[in-house]
Amino acid sequence: MSNESLANLLKEERRFAPPADLAANANVTAEAYEQAKADRLGFWAEQARRLTWATEPTETLDWSNPPFAKWFKDGKLNVAYNCVDRHVEAGHGDRVAIHFEGEPGDSRAITYAELKDEVSKAANALTELGVQKGDRVAVYLPMIPEAVVAMLACARIGAAHSVVFGGFSADAIAARIKDADAKLVITADGGYRRGKPSALKPAVDDAVSRGDGVEKVLVVRRTGQEVAWTEGRDVWWHEITAKQSAEHTPEAFDAEHPLFILYTSGTTGKPKGILHTSGGYLTQTSYTHHAVFDLKPETDVYWCTADIGWVTGHSYITYGPLSNGATQVMYEGTPDTPHQGRFWEIVQKYGVTILYTAPTAIRTFMKWGDDIPAKFDLSSLRVLGSVGEPINPEAWIWYRKHIGGDRTPIVDTWWQTETGAMMISPLPGVTETKPGSAQRPLPGISATVVDDEAREVPNGGGGYLVLTEPWPSMLRTIWGDDQRFLDTYWSRFEGKYFAGDGAKKDEDGDIWLLGRVDDVMLVSGHNISTTEVESALVSHPSVAEAAVVGAADETTGQAIVAFVILRGTANAEDDNLVADLRNHVGTTLGPIAKPKRILPVAELPKTRSGKIMRRLLRDVAENRALGDVTTLTDSSVMDLIQSKLPAAPSED
């Protein structure tokens, strides 16, 4: 970005007060902000006491060697005990922990007592296979209960898990196994996806064959499909766990004992292994899940639609909800199998009260039409959440109206793999929400927006999002590469964590996320956020989803190029539509933000976690050979876009 701050073009006037009954009974009230402001470390010490410690910590934060934080360092706990055993001991063994819904329609309910037995058996099995405290275990599984059991079993014995998303290639698995030096891999024959079995083990076999570090491969039977078998290395999960005792005494580990490594794609070079540890991570994931969703474990049914391969699945399927004794839904498959109402059918079936999903899913549901959710009873819902990227205001309003019946608060949560837990979000019983804004840092979190010179921007100004004080669930380093950790996150602004996201403050001082800094366009000397232009396009009734990039332009430096997916009724061949869309952006944001080219497309290139790969669209817009497409869900999407773009009309 240039020295001029990020343009603040989008004005949002709509406001939604918290429902009175929710506010009256909220887990967390406005007092929490004051309490945390008065004594931040005392506040986090109090949240740590929500957990069960074998040795209570006496020191909250050791920041003697910044940016390497140690939280609750003299405390000891077992993360799996906190997620399972303590609820059984408190008399909640019969409460359902997981309502599993398989894509083919099979389902099973697992109580906390059953989960404790499953985790104990798996922990005993891992020990029998030679896994010890401090070892690393790679996990490559579909969205089945064994994925959660495997993670908790690792945590129980003090082995760090490295979960690899079940859609990644053998190359990606091999790189992650090698970097973490994993000695065991847990996988499955396959999982169900889009109505048919999708094999997982072949990719593991390929990845493991490339190195000599992996001693055993533990295989869950899910689909029953044929698998290649390596005698002496491969072990069936059901066979080894069946013969284990359901008794396992969990050992207490230091609060700073590694809990997991989770790889996130670097913009360049090899993936970054984000290291999270035990005490601080569990303190913040547990507290934020309790606070932001207002979870009442006796009555709520919670559903986070993420995959456990992403940090959202780690923090808000496995650790946060289970530490709070929640009952949750876990769904294996895709939202349109066997029909486009599958999610709403699940909400209706289990009486889901809290739903946490991503803007990319919400925009897809918008594209499919309002009539689909209308067929189902969604009246059980009381809190809706959004995660993964900034949510366009129109998608926010659609989500509230068509899924939330115009009554549910929406918590738009900003956080990252690196932050470990939610950082900026409304509180459902406190905040007057604004469509499209994550609003303000949660109690105990210090975040602001700064300009190029690290000066805090005034209200109405834009720049870079930074975190100014350490937080309990922060990443401790990049696995095996402290220097890269320093260079990536701490070198840009001295003493501040740089998130890599653009942001603005509105006139009230609330924070709006504007996407990755790489997604800011410099048009005729103005910094314009792709997020704002995309939101303007999506606010047009004909547009379901939009991706915007800046392409090199001789006249303006960069020109705005937009790729749009139209709603069902709109016609891509309508010549007036492109002009109409261009004018709509001009009216909404100002003439400077009008796209030079707009191309209607059937699909957009997305990563497996649903994020739009704007980098590839930029390659197309600038007539370059495509960069790395290995994380794309469907690479044929790009061939179509490449063939169509040259013919797209351009505004002179």
From Swiss-Prot:
Mg(2+) binds at residues 538, 540, 543. It holds the Pfam family ACAS_N. CoA binds at residues 193-196, 312, 524. Acetylated. Deacetylation by the SIR2-homolog deacetylase activates the enzyme. The keyword Transcription regulation does not apply. Keywords: Acetylation, ATP-binding, Ligase, Magnesium, Metal-binding, Nucleotide-binding. The modification N6-acetyllysine is found at residue 611. InterPro entries: Ac_CoA_lig (IPR011904), ACAS_N (IPR032387), AMP-bd_C (IPR025110), AMP-bd_C_sf (IPR045851), AMP-binding_CS (IPR020845), AMP-dep_synth/lig_dom (IPR000873), ANL_N_sf (IPR042099). The keyword Acetylation applies. Its EC number is 6.2.1.1. ATP binds at residues 388-390, 412-417, 501, 516. Its cofactor is Mg(2+). GO terms for cellular component: cytosol. GO terms for molecular function: acetate-CoA ligase activity; AMP binding; ATP binding; metal ion binding. It catalyses: acetate + ATP + CoA = acetyl-CoA + AMP + diphosphate. It is an enzyme of class 6 (ligase). SUPFAM superfamilies: Acetyl-CoA synthetase-like (SSF56801). NCBIfam families: Ac_CoA_lig_AcsA, PRK00174.1. Belongs to the ATP-dependent AMP-binding enzyme family. Catalyzes the conversion of acetate into acetyl-CoA (AcCoA), an essential intermediate at the junction of anabolic and catabolic pathways. AcsA undergoes a two-step reaction. In the first half reaction, AcsA combines acetate with ATP to form acetyl-adenylate (AcAMP) intermediate. In the second half reaction, it can then transfer the acetyl group from AcAMP to the sulfhydryl group of CoA, forming the product AcCoA. This is Acetyl-coenzyme A synthetase. It comes from Streptomyces avermitilis (strain ATCC 31267 / DSM 46492 / JCM 5070 / NBRC 14893 / NCIMB 12804 / NRRL 8165 / MA-4680). The gene is acsA.
